[in-house]
Amino acid sequence: TDITDINLRLDETNDALSRIFQKGTVDFSQTKDIRASVARLKVGSSLNISELLNISAILSCEKHVKDYYEHREDSISGMLENLATVDTLNSQIKKCIISEDEISDDASSNLRSIRRSKSIANDRIHSELNKLLNSPTYRTYLQDYVITTRQGRYCLPVKAEYKSAFPGMIHDQSSTGSTLFIEPAAVVKLNNDIRELELKEAAEIEVILADLSVKAGEHTEELLCNYEILVELDCIFAKAQLARHMHASRPVMNTSGIINIKKGRHPLIEPHTVVPIDIYLGTDFKLLIITGPNTGGKTVSLKTVGLLTLMAQSGLFIPA
């Protein structure tokens, strides 16, 4: 209710609206809540892929906002100037993490080597399994000529009646019991090799995430500051967008208890059906009685005054 604070909020909305008219708006939707992640970084914990991507999103949004709105002196220029640039960290995260489900081969030379070995092992095991699929001896035993996986192991679908004739380890069976999924003895070692490489890959990914977390931990204050500023800017520009959408005007505030609304429109009623009203109160008289028949607009008028007053106190422009 402090008029100085209200006018500052209205200035911010006005300046954001001016920037929107000049250059359009910025998408703040990638501003993720990183406060819990920053708290974990402060105690030396490692972040997961999703948390690191959220940090990258904050840094990308910061850069986009600063690049998009050129320097100009107004009520929000200070916030824009206080956004901290941490490009190196953002570049490192983007280099290592492709998506929430994938770490880049470029994240480390060790990871690239492990994945290359894993690819070679996969090619070898598929080659061995294809030999069995095309073998006249084993084709009779197979329910279908496909390679499948069960419990992370490559298997072949074998007819249940031939399980004794097909050397290997049973991992699963079909719902009817007519098909057994058997890991052929010839590929057990290759399956073991792949599993070992998968464990090495997972361990290397943990090392990469831990390293990125250490680097992010060096910028906890900047990250938290950027998050708080971007949230504030998001709110300010949302107010400006609403003002633009409603064709709203900046209210002139006073401390004298005077209300003088001209062609005020209830903000929640459809624009093509709302009936504008004029309300004047506080100078010649301080009490206003509204009378009229049912559905004549008495309640809507009272609510319009209340809502427009609250909007103005919140730094919003009003539809009037």
Enumerate the language-model features and the residues they cover.
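Short, charged, amphipathic alpha-helical segments
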Residues: L52-S56, L80
